[in-house]
Design a protein with these regions (language model features):
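Flexible, glycine/charged-enriched surface loops at secondary-structure junctions
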Residues: 20-28, 43-45
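Active-site cofactor/substrate anionic-group-binding motifs, chiefly glycine-
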Residues: 44-100
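Generic N-terminal amphipathic, Lys/Arg-enriched alpha-helix
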Residues: 1-19
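Glycine-rich anion/phosphate-binding loop at the beta-strand->alpha-helix junction
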Residues: 105-112
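N-terminal and secondary-structure boundary signal
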Residues: 18-20, 35-42
Length: 112
C-alpha cells in the first residue's frame, strides 16, 4: 500500500485537530515529523513522537497559542506558552521574513 506524504500529513493533522489543536499547528507538527522520517531522522519522526504529541494535545498543550510579548518594529519576541513549538517556529519565521522586508534587518526571539 502506498500513501502519499500529503495524505499522511492530512491524516495526522486530523488526529491532532480532534484533540483540540488548531489546524495550522496540527499541520506544522505532523509535516515536521513526517519530514524527519523522510530524511531518515526517525528519532524526530512520526513513529517516535506522534503518540507523545497526541498525549500533549489531550493534556491541553496543543491548545496553547503563541503570543507577541514585545514588538519593536524590526525586533519581535514571541512566547509559545509551552505549546508544541512547531507552529510557533513557522510563525516566527513568517514574522522574520516580513519584518526583514520592511526594515532590511530583523530579529525574532521565540521562548517557552
Amino acid at each position: 500500500m502506498n500513501v502519499s506524504f500529503e495524505d499522511v500529513v492530512e491524516a495526522g493533522a486530523r488526529c491532532l485537530q480532534q484533540e483540540g489543536v488548531e489546524p495550522s499547528t496540527a499541520e506544522a507538527v505532523v509535516r515536521h515529523m513526517a519530514t524527519a522520517d523522510l530524511w531518515g531522522r526517525h528519532s524526530h519522526g512520526l513513529t517516535t513522537r506522534f503518540a507523545a504529541a497526541v498525549a500533549s494535545a489531550r493534556s491541553g498543550a496543543g491548545r496553547r497559542r503563541p503570543s507577541v510579548i514585545d514588538d519593536a518594529g524590526a525586533r519581535l519576541v514571541l512566547d509559545d506558552t509551552n505549546g508544541f513549538g512547531y507552529g510557533a517556529g513557522v510563525m516566527a519565521t513568517d514574522h522574520l521574513i516580513e519584518r526583514a522586508g520592511d526594515h532590511s534587518l530583523a530579529s525574532v526571539a521565540l521562548r517557552n
